[in-house]
């Protein structure tokens, strides 16, 4: 829960340190055919990134690696309409500090869950979004997505969480939108009695979620 994440005693009792230093070495590969990076109407974006966090580089009693993959696809449909798809994966090997676990939720993915409500060593999230311009600078969007975090246990479809929502867009500059979203999280993990409450959130920022 949120209380557990912010409670220093909880983190300490779990065997972790609430204060940790993390630095890494890494490399990445990227492929990008989007017409506009911050508000694409067509194209593909792929990014794969691998990082290594060795103890000798100053990490707090840790040696771990992290791999992330992003795949985004954009396609024009009819006049003023754009279909957008996003897939994101985050995998960690070794023993990361609490702060470096993959986090579900936030402003970009699984909107409706606050960032970090669910975290573990492995994460997969995906979403589709329909963006429709309705009049001059005004537009609307709707999305649905799903995701899951897991650790030493295996991936289980019945632990998948879902997010859906809608939003308003105002184009204050050419291809630059103000974003107002309202996202809902479907009921939490039904296998955990403390986690059955529906989550929701208003999100206000500039640029698209992906």
Roles of regions detected by a PLM:
Residues 2-5:
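Short, small-residue-biased leader/transition segments that mark boundaries at the very start
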Residues 13-18, 22-30, 34-135, 140-146, ...:
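C-terminal outer-membrane beta-barrel translocator/porin domains of Gram-negative envelope proteins
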Residues 127-129, 163-169:
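Short glycine-rich, acidic/polar surface loops and turns
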Residues 7-12, 64-67, 100-108, 157-163, ...:
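Flexible, surface-exposed loop regions and adjacent strand-edge segments
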Residues 89-105, 178-204:
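Outer-membrane beta-barrel translocator/channel fold
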Residues 26, 107, 166-180, 196-210:
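Outer-membrane beta-barrel "beta-signal"
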């Amino acid at each position: 829960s949120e209380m557990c994440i912010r409670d220093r005693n909880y983190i300490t009792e779990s065997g972790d340190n609430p204060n940790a230093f993390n630095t890494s070495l890494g490399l990445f590969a990227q492929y990008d055919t989007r017409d506009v990076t911050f508000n694409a109407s067509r194209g593909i974006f792929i990014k794969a990134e691998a990082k290594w966090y060795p103890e000798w580089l100053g990490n707090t009693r840790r040696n771990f690696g992290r791999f992330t993959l992003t795949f985004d696809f954009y396609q024009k449909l009819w006049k003023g309409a754009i279909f957008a798809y996003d897939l994101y994966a985050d995998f960690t090997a070794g023993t990361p500090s609490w702060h470096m676990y993959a986090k579900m939720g936030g402003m970009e993915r699984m909107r409706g869950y606050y960032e970090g409500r669910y975290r573990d060593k492995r994460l997969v999230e995906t979403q589709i979004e329909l963006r429709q311009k309705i009049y001059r600078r005004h537009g609307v969007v709707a999305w649905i997505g799903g995701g899951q975090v897991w650790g030493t246990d295996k991936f289980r479809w019945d632990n998948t969480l879902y997010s859906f929502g809608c939003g308003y867009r105002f184009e204050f500059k050419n291809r630059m939108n103000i974003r107002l979203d309202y996202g809902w999280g479907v009921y939490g993990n039904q296998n955990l009695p403390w986690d059955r409450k529906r989550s929701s959130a208003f999100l206000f920022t500039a640029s698209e979620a992906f």
